[in-house]
Structures are given as C-alpha cells and as structure tokens.
C-alpha cells in the first residue's frame, strides 16, 4: 500500500512561477494600505480617480463608518476590490496630489518667511524689491508701518494679514 505524495503532483516549475503565500499577503496588505489612503481623501477626489463604481461606493461608505470592527471589515472589503484594479495609476495620482500639496505648503512658508523678514528688518524691503521688481513699494511700506502701529496699539492684525495677501499676489506660486 502506497501513500500518495502530493508533493510529487506539483512540478518544480509551478512552484517557481507562483508567488509565495507570504508575498501574496504582503501585496494584499499593500492594497489595503492604499485603500486606507483613498478613504482619507475628500469625496470629490475619490470620484476624480475613475475607479470602478463598486470600489468608489465602498470607499465613500468607509468614510461614513465609525465603528472600529465594521470599519476594519470594510477596509478588508476595499482591499479585496482593489485586487481587481491596477494600483499603479492610483498610487501615482495620490503621489502627485501629495507632491502638489507639499509644494503649495512650501510656497506658503516662503511667504511667511518674507513677511516676518520684512517686518523685522528694514534692509529686507530693499532686497525684496530687488527680487520682485513689480512690487508697489509705497503700498508695501504703508502696510509695514500699519503692522507696527497695530502691534504697538494691541489691535487685531489686520495689516499683518493684508501684508500676507499682498505677498501672495507678488510672489508666484511654485509650479510643477
């Protein structure tokens, strides 16, 4: 009496061609993490991604769910639906949006640094006007004087905000 050996039924080429169980689990987990990133997006962004309707509905539903267990199950379901699509274009679109957001934030920080330098250092005004010759120097100096007056009088920072808005108009946003 011989005992069937299941290992003999599977050829070596079959074993090499299919991914390991661990590899499959890693890929499924990566899809679920991508799904979590998608759930965090605004609904308008989700619809921009041109995903299958069932996946879009599942993502929007996951945003609504607050129960931990139900949300976990929904995320697993989203991971399952993600297996049917090519995740590369979705990942690229998310990365592009994030990169765009980072550039916008860097631009805003640049504006804040200029505003702080202009307020604290009189020589910075000359440097700013040289860097951005389209600047209305009279308006800039007026706003800087008003910022100082408001600060001394403990008034709300109306001119402080107006100075920032002026800088937004003058300094171009960093483009892609």
Curated annotation (Swiss-Prot):
Keywords in alphabetical order: Cytoplasm, Ribosome biogenesis, RNA-binding, rRNA-binding
Matches recorded under InterPro entries: DarP, DarP_sf
UniProt keyword Ribonucleoprotein present: no
Its job: Member of a network of 50S ribosomal subunit biogenesis factors which assembles along the 30S-50S interface, preventing incorrect 23S rRNA structures from forming. Promotes peptidyl transferase center (PTC) maturation.
Biased composition (Polar residues): 1-10
Keyword Acetylation: no
UniProt-recorded name of the protein: Dual-action ribosomal maturation protein DarP
Record region (Disordered): 1-22
CDD domains, per the entry: YjgA-like
Organism placement in taxonomy: Bacteria, Pseudomonadati, Pseudomonadota, Betaproteobacteria, Nitrosomonadales
GO CC annotations on file: cytosol
Subcellular location field: Cytoplasm
Family in the record: Belongs to the DarP family.
Entry's Gene Ontology molecular function annotations: ribosome binding; rRNA binding
GO BP annotations listed: assembly of large subunit precursor of preribosome
């Amino acid at each position: 009496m011989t005992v069937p050996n299941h290992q003999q039924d599977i050829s070596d080429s079959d074993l090499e061609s299919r991914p390991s169980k661990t590899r499959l689990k890693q890929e499924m987990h990566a899809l679920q993490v991508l799904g979590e990133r998608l759930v965090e997006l605004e609904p308008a962004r989700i619809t921009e991604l041109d995903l299958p309707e069932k996946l879009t509905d599942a993502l929007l539903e996951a945003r609504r769910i607050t129960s931990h267990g139900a949300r976990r199950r929904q995320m697993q379901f989203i991971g399952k639906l993600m297996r049917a699509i090519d995740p590369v274009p979705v990942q690229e679109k998310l990365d592009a949006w994030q990169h765009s957001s980072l550039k916008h934030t860097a631009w805003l920080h640049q504006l804040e640094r200029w505003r702080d330098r202009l307020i604290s250092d009189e020589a910075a005004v000359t440097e700013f006007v040289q860097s951005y010759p389209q600047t209305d120097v009279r308006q800039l100096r007026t706003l800087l004087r008003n910022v100082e007056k408001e600060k001394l009088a403990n008034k709300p920072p109306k001119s402080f905000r107006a100075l920032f808005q002026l800088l937004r108009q003058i300094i171009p946003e960093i483009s892609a």
